[in-house]
Structure formats: structure tokens, C-alpha cells
From Swiss-Prot:
GO cellular component: bacterial nucleoid
Key words of the record: DNA damage, DNA recombination, DNA repair
GO BP field: DNA recombination; double-strand break repair
InterPro entries named in the record: ARFGAP/RecO (IPR037278), DNA_rep/recomb_RecO_N (IPR022572), NA-bd_OB-fold (IPR012340), RecO (IPR003717), RecO_C (IPR042242)
Physiological role: Involved in DNA repair and RecF pathway recombination.
Pfam family, one: RecO_N
Domain of life: Bacteria
Gene that produces this protein: recO
Protein name: DNA repair protein RecO
UniProt similarity note: Belongs to the RecO family.
NCBIfam families, alphabetized: reco
Organism the protein comes from: Synechococcus sp. (strain CC9605)
Length: 257
């Protein structure tokens, strides 16, 4: 295998034998790739900096099998997210999502979007409500890039526009986990949203979090937890694996409520 240079985000790092580590890296060029990092478990190793949530520049190569990291340089570390359980769970959930979305092929824009949302988690780490809201929005952005976006504009049964009638509190839409949102209460719905909840969810496809005129985040924590549940259900159904990290985030926030 030819020697090459890669820049990417370390999504996951685990043990490999007695002294090595196995690195899962997200890059623009290759999507998610796995590399052996020889000697990285030795304290004085020059490769010991291969840690989760670090942006790395690597030189990799190898004759056959699992490619090996020859050299690495840390460009940026998001390791501070591990200091609080909420941000750790949020970051882990986003890393797991990237692994699922880019395991087979590169996804254009995924690395840049992931970095952006990790930066926002760092910025908001002292505010659990913003961590929760930012995680929900990040998941929606990543799912959309990966081809699994929530269909938020039309009813999955009738094709009619999903236009939540704000103030009409008896109106409901239902999440049918395989298909999307349907107007009215539907049998077999995984969860139902009222008009303001759906309107808030629809705004999360935009670049910034929805805020009121005074700059405060729109929506109370209970609503954001429901939107997190929507993301959990959709991801589990379409990626065929539940997110333990999202569940941990939800439970952690509930415990602190």
C-alpha cells in the first residue's frame, strides 16, 4: 500500500494488541478509515497523541493488510469535551454517527460539519440546554449529508405540505419511523409532535440554532428532549443500530433536570 498523507478527525481509538492502538479516522479523501498505530500505548511513544476527538495529520502506509501510521501531528484537540458527561456523550454520539454514515464511502462535507459542531459543543459546554439543542441539530445536519435526512416538508402519506398551524393545539403530526412524518394522529406512530414542536424541528435544518429576539434559545428543555427522541428513533430505524451515546445524553440531562 502506497505511503500517503491524510488529514482527519480521530473518531475512535481502541487497543490493538499489547502496545498498539486501532484508530478510526474520518477524512475527506477516504471517509472512515482504520489504521494501526504502532507503539501508541507506550507512554513515551511519538504516536501516543493518537487520541479520540483530535484533528490529525498522518503519514500512513504498509505493504498489506491494515495500514500503519508512520507519523502524526495534532492539528487541534477537542479533548476538553470529555471533562463533562453531557458533552462527552454528545461528542461520542456524533462520532458514532459519522462512523455509520461514512463507513463505505466518503461523504462530502461531513468532516467540516463535524468540526463545526464540535466547536459549538466546546463553546456551549457550560450550558446543558445548548449542548442538547446543538446535538439535536448536529445529528440532523450529519444525517442529511449522509443521505438519511428527516423528511420535514411533506406528509409521508398524502404528500401535502407539513405546515404546522401554530396556536392550534389539538393538531398533531405522527412520526412513522420507516417513512417520515404524517399529518394527524396515526396508528403505529413512534412519537407525535404538536405544531410548535414540528416548527422548531423544521428550523434545525438551518445553519444556526433557533433563537428568540432576545437571543435566548427557542423551546424549553422538555421539547428538546422530545426532539432528541425523534433523532434517536430515526437513526435507529434507518441505520439499524441504536445510539447508546444519545441514550446516555438523554438520561444524563434528565438526571440533572
Amino acid at each position: 500500500m502506497a505511503e500517503r498523507r491524510l488529514t482527519g478527525l480521530a473518531l475512535k481509538v481502541g487497543p490493538l494488541g499489547e502496545h498498539d492502538r486501532l484508530l478510526s479516522l474520518l477524512s475527506n479523501a477516504e471517509g472512515v478509515s482504520r489504521f494501526a498505530v504502532p507503539g501508541a500505548r507506550r507512554p513515551r511513544s511519538s504516536l501516543a497523541a493518537a487520541a479520540p476527538l483530535t484533528l490529525l495529520e498522518l503519514q500512513v502506509g504498509g505493504r498489506s493488510g491494515l495500514a500503519r501510521v508512520r507519523q502524526l501531528r495534532v492539528l487541534r484537540s477537542f479533548s476538553g469535551l470529555g471533562q463533562q458527561l453531557e458533552t462527552l456523550a454528545a461528542a461520542q454520539a456524533l462520532c458514532d454517527l459519522c462512523i455509520q454514515l461514512a463507513a463505505e464511502d466518503p461523504v462530502e462535507g461531513l468532516l467540516d460539519t463535524m468540526q463545526l459542531h464540535l466547536e459549538r459543543l466546546e463553546e456551549h459546554r457550560a450550558d446543558p440546554e445548548l449542548v442538547l439543542a446543538g446535538t439535536v441539530q448536529a445529528c440532523i445536519h450529519l444525517l442529511t449529508l449522509g443521505g438519511y435526512g428527516l423528511p420535514l416538508q411533506t406528509c409521508c402519506i398524502t404528500g401535502d405540505p407539513l405546515e404546522p398551524p401554530l396556536g392550534q393545539w389539538d393538531w398533531r403530526c405522527s412520526l412513522l419511523a420507516q417513512d417520515g412524518f404524517a399529518i394527524d394522529e396515526q396508528p403505529g406512530a413512534a412519537i407525535q409532535l404538536n405544531p410548535s414542536e414540528l416548527a422548531l424541528l423544521q428550523r434545525l435544518t438551518r445553519a444556526e440554532l433557533p433563537r428568540r429576539r432576545d437571543g435566548e434559545l427557542m423551546g424549553p428543555p422538555a421539547v428538546w428532549r422530545r426532539l432528541l427522541r425523534v433523532v434517536e428513533i430515526w437513526s435507529r430505524t434507518h441505520l439499524n443500530r441504536p445510539s447508546k451515546a444519545l441514550a446516555m445524553l438523554r438520561e444524563t440531562l434528565l438526571a440533572g433536570a
